[in-house]
Amino acid sequence: MKTIFRYILFLALYSCCNTVSAYTSFIVGNNAGVDNYRGPSTAAQMTFNYTSTASNLVFYKPTQLGPTGVKMYWSYLDTGTGGGILYCNTSGRANPGPITIENAMVYSGKDYGGHKLFNTSVPGLYYTMLISRVWSAYDTITDIQSPGIYIGDPSNQEFFFSVTDSDLQTKGCNKADDYDKFWAIGGIVHNITVEFYTDTNFDPTLNQQVQLSSSSNYLYSFKAYSPGTKVVDHSNHIYVNFTLNNVKLTLPTCFTSILTGPSVNGSTVRMGEYSSGTIKNGASPVPFDISLQNCIRVRNIETKLVTGKVGTQNTQLLGNTLTGSTAAKGVGVLIEGLATSKNPLMTLKPNDTNSVYIDYETEDDTSDGVYPNQGNGTSQPLHFQATLKQDGNIAIEPGEFKATSTFQVTYP
């Protein structure tokens, strides 16, 4: 009778206990299982915005398919902020299977440097997406090696999580010892680098908006497909999307320009007072600069002069826009561009498309084509002088003088 009792007692003790597996499996999904062992109830969906303020992507005009040097970085993205959680399980059914990366990015049919290029919303503009430094809370690490994984390159992309924190293993994952019990570790933290490529189809309009094209409502996702029998029934997705709502495209440009010089007041160059004799004998030129600032990827600079009023006899002069008995007559203003490494001293003829003042920016900006979020632009002064001249043979009559003009600066 004593032997039978021990046998029955052994069975009773055995039937009340679950076996902790030698393996730890991982699944992902929403945050419904945080603090209750239930695991995710459905998928998690989140959208990360690049910036909350205006930003510009600046590209050169392409001559062939190739990289632009423009990259956008998202660092320490945490799916936990959008309710996407990584869970562990150590039941007897646990299988240490991988996490699969899937994507809904739109393949362009083009490749460069061994990587697939994916479409954006702008024709001729493509991108690659690199995921790197993937981890979770409690120093839960992955086997992803540097530089990371280019999402979408091969059809099957997987990586493995592993627990390095002994407390997480013994006080967390090991308590999830049945197929329907899960310990919530935290969000999947990772870095994303988007690099842009262009070809000759790229011809953006001014301030054109761009988005990364997708065939669904996400760009990439995480899911465990083989965490173990019955464990897999609780496995869901984490879907990740990006918006570039505050990002605009532009070709090389300077975002700010101001008029500077000792005779400058706001947007006005004050010429001073002159006698008719001084004007006839040659008035002193008044120097001024157009200071181009926050210049991104600028090299060549071309300036043209446009006005609504030129001289009566000498059309190279800016004419007086004032009329009436108090207006000066017989004079105009000559605008000259000072000598540069690209251009000798020259007269900038108003309304003449062939009269172009040329300068060149030698300094490199530090923005990598993303402004103002990544680094600083350069500054470049354009040097000019304005001289009051007699308008042909028209008699000079004293009075007030005002000329207006627009300097059209482009970056070919």
Curated annotation (Swiss-Prot):
SUPFAM superfamilies in alphabetical order: Bacterial adhesins
Main function: Part of the yadCKLM-htrE-yadVN fimbrial operon. Could contribute to adhesion to various surfaces in specific environmental niches.
Gene Ontology cellular component list: pilus
Compartments it resides in: Fimbrium
NCBIfam families found in the cross-reference section: PRK09723.1-1, PRK09723.1-2
An individual GO BP term: cell adhesion
A Pfam family it matches: Fimbrial
Disruption phenotype: Deletion of the operon under classical laboratory conditions does not result in any major effect on E.coli capacity to form biofilms compared with the wild-type strain.
Organism the protein comes from: Escherichia coli (strain K12)
Family: Belongs to the fimbrial protein family.
Origin superkingdom: Bacteria
Induction summary: Repressed by H-NS.
Protein name: Uncharacterized fimbrial-like protein YadC
Residues spanning the signal sequence: 1-22
Something else known: The operon is cryptic under classical laboratory conditions, but is functional when constitutively expressed.
Keywords: Fimbrium, Signal
